[in-house]
A protein has these predicted regions:
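Elongated alpha-helical scaffolds
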Residues: 102-105
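Membrane-water interface regions at transmembrane-helix termini and the short interhelical loops
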Residues: 81-94, 183-187, 215-216
Length: 289
C-alpha cells in the first residue's frame, strides 16, 4: 500500500514540477521583450517613430490648422493693437513708437507661426539627444530569468512535498497571468505617450499664434511647457527602467522559489506603476497643465 501511495506521490510531484517549470520558463519573456524595447521607443523622434503618422499629422497641421492659426493670429494682433492704443490714456498720449512696437510683435508672431513645425521638432530633437545620452549611461540588463535567479530549480522542486508544490503551481499560474497584464500596461504607457505627442503637435500653430499677446500668451507658453514635459517624460521613463535593471540584478538567489517569483513580480509591477507616474511628474516639473 505504501508503495502505491509513494508511486502516486512521485507521479503527482513530477506533474506539478513539470507544470511549474513550464509556467516559469517563459513567464517574463513578453515582459522582458517589452521592457527591452522601451529605450529604443522613447529615444525616437516623432518622425523616426512612425513616418506615416508623422507625415499625416504634418499635412493636417499645415493644411488645416495653420490657416485657422492665421485667423487667430490676426484677431490676437488686432486686440494687441487696441490694447496698446487704449493703454496710453485713452488716445490722449499716443506715440508713434507703439506702432513700431506692434509691427515688430506682429512680424515676430508671423515668424513663429510660419516656423511652428521647425520649433516643435527642434524641441523633440533636443529631448532625443538627452534621452540617447542617458541610455548609454543608465540602461543595463533588464531581463528576468527565474531559472538564473533560483539555481537548480527542478532539483529543488523535487525535494518539496506535494502541498507546497501545489501552492507554488497556483502561484506560478497567477503570476504568469499578471505578467501579461503588466506587458499590456507597459505597451499602453509607451505607445500612449507617442500618440499624445502626435495629438499635441497636430494643433501646434494655434497656441503658437498667441505667443505675442500679453493676455493670450499664456496659452502658447503652457503649450511649450507641455512639449518639454512630453519630451522629458522619455528621460524619466529611462530613469525608471535603469532603476528597474539595478533591482532585478540584485534579486537574492539564496531565498526560496516563491520569494524569488514574487520579488520579480513586485519589481515589474513597481516599474509599471512608475511608468504611469512619469507623465504627471514631467508636467509638474515644467508646470504644464
Amino acid at each position: 500500500m505504501d508503495f502505491i501511495w509513494d508511486s502516486i506521490t512521485d507521479w503527482l510531484k513530477e506533474v506539478l514540477v513539470s507544470g511549474i517549470v513550464s509556467n516559469l520558463s517563459g513567464m517574463f519573456d513578453s515582459t522582458n521583450e517589452q521592457i527591452g524595447e522601451i529605450a529604443g521607443q522613447v529615444g525616437l523622434t516623432p518622425q523616426a517613430w512612425n513616418s506615416g503618422i508623422f507625415n499625416m499629422i504634418q499635412n493636417l497641421s499645415n493644411n488645416v490648422i495653420l490657416p485657422l492659426a492665421g485667423a487667430i493670429l490676426a484677431i490676437v494682433m488686432t486686440l494687441e493693437l487696441i490694447q496698446l492704443i487704449t493703454d496710453r490714456n485713452n488716445l490722449n498720449d499716443v506715440d508713434t513708437w507703439m506702432f513700431f512696437k506692434w509691427v515688430f510683435k506682429s512680424a515676430a508672431a508671423v515668424l513663429i507661426v510660419s516656423n511652428t513645425w521647425t520649433i516643435v521638432m527642434g524641441i523633440f530633437d533636443a529631448d532625443q539627444s538627452v534621452v540617447n545620452g542617458a541610455a548609454g549611461v543608465m540602461i543595463g540588463n533588464t531581463s528576468i530569468d527565474i531559472s538564473s535567479v533560483v539555481t537548480d530549480l527542478e532539483s529543488r522542486l523535487m525535494e518539496m512535498d506535494v502541498g507546497p508544490l501545489l501552492g507554488l503551481w497556483f502561484q506560478s499560474l497567477f503570476v504568469g497571468i499578471c505578467t501579461w497584464a503588466i506587458t499590456i500596461c507597459i505597451f499602453i504607457v509607451i505607445y500612449g505617450r507617442m500618440i499624445e505627442v502626435y495629438l499635441v503637435t497636430s494643433v501646434a500653430p494655434i497656441p503658437m499664434a498667441t505667443m505675442a499677446n500679453r493676455e493670450w500668451g499664456q496659452m502658447g507658453q503652457n503649450y511649450l511647457r507641455t512639449l518639454f514635459a512630453l519630451g522629458f517624460q522619455a528621460f524619466l521613463i529611462m530613469v525608471c527602467v535603469a532603476i528597474y535593471s539595478v533591482l532585478v540584478q540584485n534579486i537574492s538567489v539564496s531565498g526560496d522559489i516563491s520569494n524569488a517569483i514574487w520579488t520579480c513580480m513586485g519589481y515589474t509591477v513597481l516599474l509599471c506603476f512608475c511608468l504611469f507616474k512619469t507623465s504627471s511628474l514631467a508636467r509638474s516639473v515644467f508646470n504644464a497643465h
